[in-house]
Amino acid sequence: MAKEELLEFPGVVKELLPNATFRVELENGHEIIAHTAGKMRKNRIRVLAGDKVQVEMTPYDLTKGRINYRFK
């Protein structure tokens, strides 16, 4: 089965939620719930409120996403 195309959007972390999840406001104004990617957890990259991040989402559920990069 082919890997589905992921949608990538820049956004800003608005709120930290329990269980290592975050409320992220995307550039287009939508708010989603996102968790950190495994490589970010492994390398202990911290994400705080106000950080600019890159979020990838699947086209099947546009309310959830994965944070795969934190901009410096």
Swiss-Prot record:
InterPro entries: NA-bd_OB-fold, RNA-binding_domain_S1_IF1, S1_domain, TIF_IF1
PANTHER family on file: TRANSLATION INITIATION FACTOR IF-1, CHLOROPLASTIC
Keywords in alphabetical order: Cytoplasm, Initiation factor, Protein biosynthesis, RNA-binding, rRNA-binding
Protein name listed in UniProt: Translation initiation factor IF-1
Ranges of residues in domain S1-like: 1-72
Gene for this chain: infA
A Pfam family assignment: eIF-1a
Organism domain of life: Bacteria
Location(s) in or outside the cell: Cytoplasm
Oligomer status and interactors: Component of the 30S ribosomal translation pre-initiation complex which assembles on the 30S ribosome in the order IF-2 and IF-3, IF-1 and N-formylmethionyl-tRNA(fMet); mRNA recruitment can occur at any time during PIC assembly.
A GO-annotated cellular component: cytosol
Naturally occurring in which organism (per UniProt): Dinoroseobacter shibae (strain DSM 16493 / NCIMB 14021 / DFL 12)
PROSITE patterns: S1_IF1_TYPE (PS50832)
